């Protein structure tokens, strides 16, 4: 399974297994990418990207951050972005993986005077399972994760549908996607809840409940040559009222963007048509 790197900085816009922003995979089909090298060969790429991350907390501006972009595949193991995984099943039509990754989330009261008196919420690590169904150029991906450090004691799950268009014999491609993200009441309450101790004038107590967020995105790539690739991703998400009604949240919609360049090391796949 070949994924573009994912990177998100807020759990409210994080794609489970995303993470963030996990770009659609390169699908098989009439304009399919060239065959991958044998699975026993190490395949990896490294690059640099820039992300623009919406931060919905009151008084906190969007953040633009440079990030390293890493992909590594060896046999059934892989690392991409902020996640690592193992393929239990990996066929042309189905994949079933165990996956672990960082949750780049959290609240820092120093980020805004309007958050004064809030207790810091920490990033965490999540683990879970991902099932992908890949009929032709389409992909239906379902994932479920739990916070294994117990910071939020919460879970999140997602279902995404995407379609890949490949052009000019794999020179460039586009993939739109739509999806939904469910987050448990514990997770929502941890990141946007307000405890009685955090109440201030204009900031009443708030207890978060489970939320269902909607998102849509567009991923694209352009291969400069067999080793250098440009990638881009833009994703919009609408937050559930269970999140946007929190007194420490002032945005119900957000946009995430990523642009980057990567260099592929090691063995190369055969050129298309060779």
Residue ranges and their predicted role:
Residues 1-40, 266-274:
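Cleavable N-terminal export/targeting peptides
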Residues 42, 62-68, 92-94, 121-127, ...:
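Residues that define the transmembrane beta-barrel architecture of outer-membrane proteins
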Residues 46-52, 83, 98-102, 129, ...:
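Transmembrane beta-barrel strands of outer-membrane/channel proteins
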Residues 22-78, 266:
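Short glycine/proline- and aromatic-enriched beta-strand/turn motifs that initiate or cap beta-hairpins
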């Amino acid at each position: 399974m070949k994924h573009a790197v994912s990177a998100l900085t807020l759990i409210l816009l994080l794609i489970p297994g995303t993470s963030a922003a996990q770009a659609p995979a390169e699908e098989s089909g009439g304009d399919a990418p060239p065959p991958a090298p044998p699975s026993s060969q190490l395949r990896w790429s490294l690059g640099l990207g820039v992300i623009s991350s919406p931060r919905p907390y009151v008084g906190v501006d969007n953040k633009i951050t440079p990030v390293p972009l890493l992909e590594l595949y060896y046999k059934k193991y892989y690392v991409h972005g902020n996640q690592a995984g193992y393929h239990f099943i990996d066929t042309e039509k189905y994949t079933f993986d165990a996956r672990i990754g960082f949750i780049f989330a959290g609240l820092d009261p120093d980020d805004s005077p309007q958050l004064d008196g809030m207790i810091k919420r920490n990033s965490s690590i999540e683990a879970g399972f991902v099932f992908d169904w890949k009929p032709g150029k389409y992909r239906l991906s379902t994932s479920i994760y739990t916070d294994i450090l117990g910071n939020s004691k919460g879970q999140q799950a997602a279902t995404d549908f995407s379609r890949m268009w490949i052009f000019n014999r794999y020179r460039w491609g586009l993939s739109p996607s739509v999806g939904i993200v469910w987050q448990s009441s514990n997770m929502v309450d941890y990141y946007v809840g307000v405890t009685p101790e955090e109440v201030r004038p204009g900031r009443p107590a708030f207890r978060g409940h489970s939320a269902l967020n909607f998102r849509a995105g567009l991923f694209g790539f352009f291969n400069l040559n067999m080793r250098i690739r440009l990638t881009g991703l833009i994703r919009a998400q609408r937050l559930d009222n269970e999140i946007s009604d929190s007194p420490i949240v002032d945005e119900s919609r957000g946009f995430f963007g990523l642009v980057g360049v990567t260099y592929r090391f090691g063995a190369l796949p055969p050129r298309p048509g060779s």
